[in-house]
Amino acid sequence: MECLPNLVSEYNGITLSEFNLDAALARHPQLILVDELAHTNAPVCRHTKRYQDIEELLNAGIDVYTTINVQHIESINDTVASITGIMVHERIPDSVFDNASQVELVDIEPQELIERLQAGKVYSPTQAERATENFFTVENLTALREIAL
C-alpha cells in the first residue's frame, strides 16, 4: 500500500509530522485512508482540523476511510465529560459524522486496549502512562464502549 509523505514542520521547537493534504490532492487516489478525524492540525496546515482536510478530499472526488473515537463527537461531549470527568477538546461537529456514507464500529475489550497502550502500541510510553492513569481506565473505556454500541 502506498504511503504519502507527511508534511514535516517545526512548531515551538518540536518537529511535527502531519497529513499532507496537497500531496493527497495531487496524487488523487480513488480511496485514501486518513487516521484521526478529530485531530487538530499544526499551524502550518491549510485547515485547523483534520475533518476539514477530509471534507476537501471528498469535495475533490476522493473517497476517504478515517477513524474516530466516540468521545470526539460533539453531541456526546457532555455525556463523556460527566462519565470521565475529562472535557475532550478535539471534537468534530455532529454534521461531519452524520454525513458519513458508512460507519463501521471497531471494538476492543477495555483491558485489551489498556494492554496495547502499556505495550507502546498506541502512544509513546510517557503518553501511554498518562492516558491509562487518567482517561483510559477500564471504567471509562467500558462506559465509552456502551455509548458507541
Language-model features: where?
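Structural recognition of the conserved hydrophobic beta-strand(s) that form the central parallel beta-sheet
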Residues: 32-34, 63-70, 99, 106
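Short, hinge-like loop/turn segments at secondary-structure boundaries
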Residues: 1-4, 82-86
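Conserved P-loop/Walker A NTP-binding site and adjacent catalytic elements of P-loop NTPases
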Residues: 1-63
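C-terminal accessory "lid"/substrate-recognition subdomains
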Residues: 91-98, 102-149
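Glycine-rich, flexible loop/turn motifs
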Residues: 12, 79, 88
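Conserved protein kinase catalytic core
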Residues: 41-42, 75, 113
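An amphipathic, basic-hydrophobic helix/alpha-beta surface used to engage anionic
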Residues: 44-45, 61-64, 70, 104, ...
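Signature of the SF2 helicase/ATPase Hel1-core->accessory helical subdomain module
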Residues: 49-50, 55-85, 110
